[in-house]
Each structure stands twice: as structure tokens, then as C-alpha cells.
Amino acid sequence: MAGSQLKNLKAALKARGLTGQTNVKSKNKKNSKRQAKEYDREEKKKAIAEIREEFNPFEIKAARNKRRDGLPSKTADRIAVGKPGISKQIGEEQRKRAFEARKMMKNKRGGVIDKRFGERDKLLTEEEKMLERFTRERQSQSKRNANLFNLEDDEDDGDMFGDGLTHLGQSLSLEDELANDEEDFLASKRFNEDDAELQQPQRKKTKAEVMKEVIAKSKFYKQERQKAQGIMEDQIDNLDDNFEDVMSELMMTQPKKNPMEPKTDLDKEYDIKVKELQLDKRAAPSDRTKTEEEKNAEAEEKKRELEQQRLDRMNGMIELEEGEERGVEDLDDGFWENEEDYEDDNDGIADSDDDIKFEDQGRDEGFSQILKKKNISISCPRTHDALLDQVKKLDLDDHPKIVKNIIKAYQPKLAEGNKEKLGKFTAVLLRHIIFLSNQNYLKNVQSFKRTQNALISILKSLSEKYNRELSEECRDYINEMQARYKKNHFDALSNGDLVFFSIIGILFSTSDQYHLVITPALILMSQFLEQIKFNSLKRIAFGAVLVRIVSQYQRISKRYIPEVVYFFQKILLTFIVEKENQEKPLDFENIRLDSYELGLPLDVDFTKKRSTIIPLHTLSTMDTEAHPVDQCVSVLLNVMESLDATISTVWKSLPAFNEIILPIQQLLSAYTSKYSDFEKPRNILNKVEKLTKFTEHIPLALQNHKPVSIPTHAPKYEENFNPDKKSYDPDRTRSEINKMKAQLKKERKFTMKEIRKDAKFEARQRIEEKNKESSDYHAKMAHIVNTINTEEGAEKNKYERERKLRGGKK
């Protein structure tokens, strides 16, 4: 077992002859001459260094010997590759020398430093750079001592640059004159003696001399400006003194006015023509005549664009100008922005596209005579009562004629403000159509039909130009209808409400996912179908008309309305159940019927031809007739036709068609079993069976993914393996790039390491300098305090001695 470190150190020193007995005398006196030392001084230092390295293994960086020869041993496995301690010390010394050199050269290096603002900034223009430089120069000047070179204060001039300067930079003192004379004499003498030196360049002026010249010139120019200003002020004062005299002379002589010559008629006509030409609309260049193929292509493109816009509205997505899409919730925001821009463009245009044109543009002389005979004046009514005052003396067939005359008389091109008047009149015309629908017209049904169709046609033409006013009026009417229904329920509804729902389906797009008029109307109709108690034939007929209108709304968009399905189930069940205690068909126990008195008897003859159309004027008389069975059958047939149309146009394309039609299919089967001669439900069932065959209904299931195989990592063998080759990339260019990247990474890592070492060293040096300055300061202060204390103590002792002496004398 090895001994301690101390014993090993003594043994190593003794083995190298550095310790032990060195003055042993030789027994042979013959050879007693002084021998040379076994180790000289250099060898001794080398031996000590080897011993130090041997006993301090941490001072040497060792690495594994990859190419060792001979027997394995503890020391042969590792070889010395460096001395980190010495390397660190050398690095510290180099950094210290560099730091001292930078410290010595600080603020002593010459050269021109470009400190101008924004010189290398490419984003700034030349004007911005000059403005910012001027601003910074002003700020730097304001920060300096304001009185350093103050031109107004002459007292500071002598403090810094000698005696004060006066006019033209010359001093008035006698000493300056003597000094100047002496200098002139010396200068003339020097000029005669040293003529050759005049050819050499003059010496550079000092800063003090330059500033003296600048201040002298500034004061001289300032004095000249003051003189010029004084002269100008004197001239102004003289002019002010003579101003009143000059103006009084000018007022005495008034110029003669030339009398106005009257214009001739020819000149007046010329001026009028010029005014008319200025006010006339400029002629626009006409487009070239297009061929029939081009016209058809433009028409097809326009139709395709409109259809795409309709599909986008139906899907609830509208694209903005910036490219982003907005959904249903954003449609109400800025709905009329484009129309307002369109109105602003067309204001003041005499012949604009807002003019309403009819097929019969000619003047009806016969109707004009009727108006004159009955003393009816044409005016554009702003309310429905005003329109009723105009048409109360006319027949029902003359209502469209007077409406057309009003529109012709108030075309937008005729006068300013007619456009707003026709917008109001469009809303009034809608109210008038609803008003006529609520009247009793059993005696003149055909006349009412012609008048109603003509007024609706006119309203459709007006809606294309005044859509905003009409939409606002429709929304107001929907709110009124809802308020009436909330207060009086079904009794508040009328035939005019059904006509209103039909008209807006013609005027507006019903396929939009959200519309300012159609969507509230559809919600209100669904509320009626859900909440109305269908306990009378009139109410059922009213609901049948509503269902027909709703189905007409959804013929394009094909959206599922649950209230329609509920209405069909409830009405079909109402007509088949006669008594309250009668057993209902399966799956309809949860439907509560409003009446059990409308059930059809078993002996109803369905082979008899009956009308399936429900005229609106017959709704009021349905419950008053004595034999309502035929009317019940007519209403049932109307409901069956509505069901057939809804299945064909709306439901068949829905993915849940089987689930929607299943309860209705059971009711139709009950009708076929109870009434064998009833062909309509049997035909509907056959259609449903055919549609069910073509309807592919796939139930929901999880997505079936392909199973992922477990990755196998087989070892890769290189046939031509070379341990010296680090990369097996066949692409030589890529291999060189990777090699360069690795080298850059290594250099970057080494550079960052050196930068961190330099930063840490500089931080340590700055801390040492601060500590040294602090210690010097404290030592200096301590020395001063000790000196003061010593002087105070000496003075105190002196005072005590004097006091004692004075006390002894007493």
C-alpha cells in the first residue's frame, strides 16, 4: 500500500538528489578536490517541475490513448494533451494586456467619426435627415453654456479671449495700440529678413482666434442690420406722418363712373343660351353596337353571376371587398351601404334609371276626362288615408290607373325630391293592397282579382327601385301583426295577412339564409302554425294556406321546417278521429287535438270531384254554412296536395327523409284502410315508397382508418466501411456544405466561449478598479480625518497648557 503524499514527496526528492546529506567527505584525501555538482540549476528546476506535475495531476489534461503500444498500464492508457491551468493563466495575461492597451488608447485615438443622424438609414428621406440634424444641433447648442459666446454680453469676451472687442473687432485701449504698433514693426522687420518664408503656408489658426473673428464679424453685421433697420423705421415714421395728407388729397379727386349701357335683346338671349348650355348635361360617349352573340353572352354571364350571388346568400356566406367572408350575423350591419352610394350618385340626374316605365306609356284621355269630371287632383300621397281620399270617388278597376298616373306625374327626372316621394308611395301602395284584401268583395270577385294583380305588378316594378322603403314598411307590418296576434290571438289575423305573406314571397328572395323581411315573416308564420288552435274549419284553412306559402318559400333552399311537419300530423289526425275516446294511431298519443268535431264520417264519398283551391273570400263563410262536410273534404284535399308538393320539392332531398315521412306515412296508411275509395293518400304512399328506394341512408359511424404497422428498424451495413470517413453522403456538394456548417458551428461555439470569457474578465477588471478607487478614497479620507484630529488634539493640548498657566499665575 502506498504511503502518504508527504512520504512520497520526500522519496521523490531524495531519489533525484535534491534532499539528503550533500556534504559527505571522501575518505581518499588524494582525490579531495572539489567535484562538480551533480545537477546544475536548470536541471534542478526541471526536476522540481516534473515532481510538481507528478504530484498535482489536475494541472494536466489527459486523454485516452487510442494507439498505445506495449503492455497495458495505468499510465499508458492516458496521455497528456494540455495544461489547462497554464493555458488559463496565459489567456488571462493576454486579456489583461489587451485591456490595458484599450484603456491606454481610450479617448486618444484620432480620426473622423460620422455622428450625423440617419446617415445609414435607408428609410429616411434627405429632408427628414436634414430636419432631424438641424433639430439635434439646436438642442445641443441650447445645452451648452448660454453665456459662453453670447454676442449681447461684452463682459464675457475679455474673460476668455483677452480684451473686449468693439467696432470692427478693434480695442480702444492704449495698450492695445502700443502692442499693435510693436507687432507691426516686428512684422515689417520680419518681412524684410525672411522673404523666403512667405512662400510657405501660414500656420493654422487656433480656436480662440477663429472665435474672435467670428464674434467680430457677427457684431459688425449686427450693427449694419441695426443701421438699416433704423433707416427703414425713420422712413416709415415719415410716411405715417404724411399718410393723412395723401389720403385727403386722394379723396378729393373721385373717378368718373361710366354709365351702364342697357343690354339689347340679342345680348340677353345670348346670355340665356350660355346659361342653358352650362346647365345642360354633357353628352356621354356611346358604346359600340354589340352583336347578338355578345348580348346573349353578357346576359348569360349576368344570370350566372346573379345565381352565384343567390347561392352564396342561401349558404349564408357573403364575401367582402377585402376578401374576408362574413356570416349570417353580419348581414344586418351596413345592409344599405351600397344603396346609399347609388342614391348619392343619382341625385340631381335628370334622366336616371329610377324612372318607372310601364307597358302602356301613352296618355289615357278617357281616364283624364273622368278625373276632371269628378274633380280629382293628382298628388303623391304620403299616407294610406290620403290615397283613400283620392280613390274614394273612383271604381275599383280605376285604382291601377290612378296609381300609374301618380307615378308618371312624380318621376324622379321631373323634379327634385320626387324620388323620396315615390319611396313613401311604394309603402302606401303595399298598405292599399292589404286594405283591399280585407274588404268584402264577394259580388265583384273578378274585378277585385284584376285590380289586385295590376297593383301587385306595379308594386313589383316599384320594389326594384325603392327596395329600402318597401323593406322597412314590411318589417313594420310584421311587427304590427305580431303585436295583434299577441293581444287577440287568431281573431286579430285577416285575409290581408295571407296576401302580405304571398306578396313578399314574390318581391324578395326567399332562398337567403337570412333576409331582413323573409326571415322575420317565416318565423312569424311558424309561430302561427305552432300556436293557433285548429278547432274550426276556418282556422284549418288558414293554416293550410300558410303551409302552402311556407312550402313555396322553401322550394329552392329546401330547408326543414318542423312546424310544417307538426301541422300535417295534427290536421290529418284531426280529420280521421271522430270522437275523443277513439283510439289514435300508433305514435300519435303525444299530439293533443284541438277539436274532435271535424272528423270525417265513414260514408264520405271521395269519388266526387271537389275543388282543392281555397279562395280567400270563402274563409269568412266556412263556419256559417249548414253542410260543412264538402268544405272539410276540400280542405283535406288541399292539405293532401300541399303534403304531396312538399314531399316532391322539399323533403325528398333531405338526408333525414325516412325519419320525417315515417309518422305521416302511418297516418296515410290509416286513411287508406279507413276510406278505401280515397285515392290521394294511396298515391302519396306509392310516391314515398319509390323515393325511399332511391334514398341511401347510411348511419353514422366512426371513421375507419387503415391500421398502422409497427415500424421495423433493420441495421444498415456499409460494404465499403472506412473509419476515417465521417460521411457517406454520395452528393459531394452537400457533403462539403455539411462540413462547412459543422466547421462554422465549431468556430461559432469557440468564439462565443471567448467572448464570454472576455466579458467576464472585463467585468472583474472594472470591479477591481472600482474597489481600488473606493479603497484609495477611504484611505485618503481617513488620512485627512487623522490629520485634522491630530491638529485639533495639539491645539487642545496647547489650550489646556495655557489655561493652566493662567490659572497658576492667579
Curated annotation (Swiss-Prot):
Interacts with snoRNA U3. Interacts with EMG1, MPP10 and NOC4. Component of the ribosomal small subunit (SSU) processome composed of at least 40 protein subunits and snoRNA U3. GO terms for cellular component: 90S preribosome; mitochondrion; Noc4p-Nop14p complex; nucleolus; nucleoplasm; nucleus; preribosome, small subunit precursor; small-subunit processome. The keyword Metal-binding does not apply. It comes from the Eukaryota. This is Nucleolar complex protein 14. Residues 1-44, 63-95, 134-155, 276-308, 338-358, 788-810 are annotated as: Disordered. One of its GO terms (biological process) is endonucleolytic cleavage in ITS1 to separate SSU-rRNA from 5.8S rRNA and LSU-rRNA from tricistronic rRNA transcript (SSU-rRNA, 5.8S rRNA, LSU-rRNA). Involved in nucleolar processing of pre-18S ribosomal RNA. Has a role in the nuclear export of 40S pre-ribosomal subunit to the cytoplasm. Keywords: Nucleus, Ribonucleoprotein, Ribosome biogenesis, rRNA processing. It is found in: Nucleus, Nucleolus. GO terms for molecular function: U3 snoRNA binding. Residues 338-357 have a biased composition (Acidic residues). InterPro entries: Nop14. Residues 35-44, 68-77, 793-810 have a biased composition (Basic and acidic residues). It holds the Pfam family Nop14. Belongs to the NOP14 family.
